[in-house]
Amino acid sequence: MALSTNSTTSSLLPKTPLVQQPLLKNASLPTTTKAIRFIQPISAIHSSDSSKNTPIVSAKPSSPPAATSTAAATAVTKQEWSIDSWKTKKALQLPEYPNQEELKNVLKTIEDFPPIVFAGEARHLEEKLGEAAMGRAFLLQGGDCAESFKEFNANNIRDTFRILLQMGAVLMFGGQMPVIKVGRMAGQFAKPRSDNFEEKNGVKLPSYRGDNVNGDAFDLKSRTPDPQRLIRAYCQSAATLNLLRAFATGGYAAMQRVTQWNLDFTEHSEQGDRYRELANRVDEALGFMNAAGLTTDHPIMTTTEFWTSHECLLLPYEQSLTRLDSTSGLYYDCSAHFLWVGERTRQLDGAHVEFLRGIANPLGIKVSDKMDPSALVKLIEILNPQNKAGRITIITRMGAENMRVKLPHLIRAVRGAGQIVTWVSDPMHGNTIKAPCGLKTRPFDSIRAEVRAFFDVHEQEGSHPGGVHLEMTGQNVTECIGGSRTVTFDDLSSRYHTHCDPRLNASQSLELAFIIAERLRKRRLGSQSVLGQ
């Protein structure tokens, strides 16, 4: 049943009481010897093949991490974990709710709600990310900087999904490998802030932390953290994912349709000639497949796999949606398939790392030029002590010049520790500037330069560029300057709709996909020529 933001919350409550289940020990994640609260085990769907539920591990024993890494990480990984053990650690970036009793009641209500995603889907994503770590797949992760209640409608969801489909088709053809499509959608509300308060004209109010916490209007009522927003965020996330599932499996994602969209883009792009050749080759490939008997109405050509992700920031909410999976005996945060820890909350002894080390979802780590290589090795050891491929994705956000200087040291440290990770470029956050009009923006040329640096470094180091992570939208906004359909500083205010950071619009996103696809193609052809020598 599709969820609606207009539904009453009582209609979402389960009809039967939750049943306490024994907590199962497992080899790969921390366990707890006592039940903290009643947990209803969630059986994984999409996992009828039991072999698909087997965690991927490295094919041969990895090299032991450096002694300093082992000593620092072992103390954390040996500690008993429970779904609320994070409360014993220092938690940064959490809002202060004035009404704690109301917060407690809201969290209890969400605990009783159904999961938004399923454990089997998260396991399947981990397998796919393991392929990306080995250079056999490519991650495309994109969506809003921060989802909002005001802009929640089917058209916006459809447009972002559509552009991700178009980008995925281009990247898949360029790299001749599967593209893992993950949306920053269906839960990407909360945002970390550098300051707890914002001051305007002598008035000081709490900072806006995302629509699931407070409102962006600068008044006391809007800025006061409201627990009821968590329930609305849950309902919007569930409704968004419901629509995404329908789009992914109902024919909207048909490859022939996506290819025609890309051909239309090249016809109307100022640099269309540059991209038309690739788009035409995709169209010809579909014609060949049709002639060979793999018709375009085959299920593999009309459906796609799609996963959701968001930053793991609001720990009380994440805990409320954590469930014990009856298939594996592992805990999964069922708010999203993939969660990442941000630059501001990745402290080794912090609450966010403590929570994430105990859930079985695939995890991301945002890494800037401030990250020390040895600290990264320690963090990976805490979050992935069994060295499972696909468990950890490193999302680098540095700016082009810092990327060339800092990334090689991180790659060498991780490789030296024998750790398996998927390397991904976030070319957005390291390239934010302030326009003359005062609005934040990101130059497309700087974004492109960071992606180029990412590929250059991996080529230099002999490692695998595993994907890109983008803040983007399917709407025709004017938030990032540049691109073939040039957006100038003067254009910014005309369609500047973001609630937080500037996003690539549909045209800029697809243009970047064509650029990356060409780089993937050159890398593939280079590898083939080396093998042919």
UniProtKB/Swiss-Prot annotation:
Enzyme class, UniProt record, top EC level: transferase
Transit peptide, start-end: 1-57
A Gene Ontology molecular function term of the record: 3-deoxy-7-phosphoheptulonate synthase activity
Family annotation (Pfam families): DAHP_synth_2 (PF01474)
Reactions this protein catalyses: D-erythrose 4-phosphate + phosphoenolpyruvate + H2O = 7-phospho-2-dehydro-3-deoxy-D-arabino-heptonate + phosphate
Biased composition annotated in UniProt, kind: Low complexity: 57-70
Cofactor info, note text: Binds 1 divalent metal cation per subunit that could be manganese.
Cofactor(s), by name: Mn(2+)
Protein name: Phospho-2-dehydro-3-deoxyheptonate aldolase 1, chloroplastic
Organism: Petunia hybrida
